[in-house]
Amino acid sequence: MHRKELLNLLARYRSRFMEEEAFVRRAIEFVNQHEKIFDRETPVHVTGSAWVVSPDREQVLLMHHRKLNQWFQPGGHADGDADILRVALRECAEETGLEPSHIRLIDSMIFDVDIHTTPPMGNTPLHEHIDIRFVVEIDDWLPIPGNDESHAVEWFPLYQVLRYNNNRSTYRMLEKTRGIRNFHRTIPTQERHAAKALW
């Protein structure tokens, strides 16, 4: 996936949330107008994250970010990698501490798009993330070791998630999760093999 492929994904994506539609339009404009969109050194850059659900779609996996002191889905910087789906899957594996084989891609299409400001930390100034999210599935019985970027990684029932992160983008993703609750099927086998090849 490169800039053109990301543009294709964004162009095909539709949201029923007005603020997210505005994010998508801005993301398309940004990707069209800039080249170094995957580098964290730029004041605005594209990031990737994974919204993790249990197989029954009744729980969401969140990590308590050590630096930001908030609960978020796994995700992070692309660091020059233009394949934003691969970035999301890689970050999910790193931040959960799980082997990639335990992370199953539900859909290779975009699940959510968000644009948000990240506060300055250390030598890193205030900057903006254009975060491209994909939905994945992990078995909720697996031990989740996490890594040093988080204080904890925990499963939460859908009805509890907003107690820990009540921002608008979390609300959107919860609503979308409720929409796929009865769809307990991951992507077809051939696509799953293609997803594994991303690693």
Per-segment meaning from a language model:
Residues E58-L98, W199:
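Conserved Nudix-box catalytic region and its N-terminal flanking loop in Nudix hydrolases
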